[in-house]
UniProtKB/Swiss-Prot annotation:
Subcellular compartments: Mitochondrion outer membrane
Cellular compartments per GO CC: MICOS complex; mitochondrial outer membrane
Residues in the Mitochondrial intermembrane compartment per record: 139-145
Protein name as annotated: MICOS complex subunit MIC27
Membrane topology: Multi-pass membrane protein
UniProt keyword list: Membrane, Mitochondrion, Mitochondrion outer membrane, Transit peptide, Transmembrane, Transmembrane helix
Keyword set includes Transmembrane helix: yes
Description of how the protein assembles with itself and partners: Component of the mitochondrial contact site and cristae organizing system (MICOS) complex.
FT transit peptide: 1-31
Gene name for this UniProt entry: moma-1
Cytoplasmic side: 32-117, 167-201
Length: 201
């Protein structure tokens, strides 16, 4: 009958085994690191990448847009026209300058005519009103023609310039009232100086 080992010895043997296992594991880990470090080649600082993405560039693929029907033909015609115009404009700069100025003047004239409440349409309307008054007064003699023409011009001017017509009417009324009041008031008679016609004494 064999005698069992004491418990203290058993615990010490287990501790030694665990220590040996950890030592072997540490040797394996350190040996792998040393071999890997030995295989790497040293590089210069200038060769190090600034960003991590430099080592793995992204592959990009651009898909060209398919042209529409007749797009290439129109593009060819447009490019040819532009080239011809540039060539002609370079040789005839005076003609190009004149064409540009004419285009600007035509644009300004069109904008002026199409804009509302400009002087030209108003002048045309006032002229038409005066001509209508003149035609209506043909059978009334010179005074009648002058009167109807003046009435036609004044009527169309009042329609075209309503604010100014109101101001003129107010001013005329004020002057008329002042003239009427002045006419109604009789002037103050001056003191009559009697002349002494008796002979001197």
């Amino acid at each position: 009958m064999t005698q069992d080992k004491p418990i203290v010895e058993t615990i010490s043997n287990a501790g030694e085994q665990v220590t040996n296992v950890f030592g072997q594991f540490w040797q394996l880990v350190t040996s792998k690191n040393t071999t890997n470090n030995g295989d790497s080649k040293p590089i210069k600082i200038e060769q190090l990448p600034i960003y991590a993405e430099d080592n793995a560039p992204l592959k990009q693929k651009f898909l060209p847009e398919e042209p529409l029907p007749l797009q290439r033909e129109f593009a060819t015609i447009r490019i040819a026209c532009e080239q011809e115009y540039d060539r002609v404009a370079e040789r005839f700069k005076v003609v190009d300058c004149a064409m540009t100025q004419t285009k600007k003047a035509a644009t300004k004239c069109n904008a002026y005519l199409t804009e509302e409440w400009t002087a030209l349409p108003k002048a045309a309307a006032i002229t038409v009103g005066g001509m209508a008054g003149f035609v209506l007064g043909l059978k009334r003699g010179p005074v009648g023609r002058l009167l109807t023409t003046t009435i036609g011009l004044a009527t169309m001017a009042a329609f075209c310039y309503p604010i100014e017509a109101v101001d003129v009417a107010k001013t005329g009324r004020a002057h008329a009232e002042q003239t009427w009041y002045s006419f109604q008031e009789s002037p103050t008679p001056s003191a009559i100086v009697k002349t002494n016609l008796s002979p001197p004494k």
